């Protein structure tokens, strides 16, 4: 259990197992333990996926936007449990996702996650 309200990338990497190039959150700017958080993903032209998606008009793939949301949610949950390095989280489903605006190099994505419920070891986030 952590009492900090903001986390930099070094702190995030102590909780999440993801590493470059798949760590897709850069900072936690606000967290209320067991309730919700706000995370930031800074998108730069140096992201490896921009080489092929799409070379002339780079756009962050939707599946990686979802992954950044999953990582923020995992951080929210793992930050509240004792000994988070001994826990495994698995993303199992998503519903009602819509992408209205493309994310391009130079954008800063704000990810807000809210804990809805925990039941029988399953976590529902919004």
Where are these regions (language model features)?
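Short aromatic-glycine motifs in intrinsically disordered, low-complexity regions
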Residues: 7-19, 86
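Active-site helix/loop of acyl-thioester processing domains in fatty-acid/polyketide metabolism
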Residues: 28, 60-84
């Amino acid at each position: 259990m952590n009492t900090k309200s903001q986390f930099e990338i070094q702190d995030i990497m102590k909780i999440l197992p993801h590493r470059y190039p798949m760590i897709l959150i850069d900072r936690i700017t606000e967290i209320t333990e067991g309730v919700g958080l706000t995370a930031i993903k800074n998108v730069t032209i140096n992201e490896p996926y921009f080489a092929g998606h799409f070379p002339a008009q780079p756009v962050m793939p939707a599946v990686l936007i979802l992954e950044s949301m999953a990582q923020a949610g995992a951080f929210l949950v793992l930050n509240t449990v004792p000994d988070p390095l001994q826990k495994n989280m698995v993303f199992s489903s998503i519903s009602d996702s819509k992408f209205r605006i493309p994310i391009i190099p130079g954008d800063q994505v704000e990810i807000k996650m809210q804990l809805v419920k925990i039941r029988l070891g399953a976590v529902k986030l919004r």
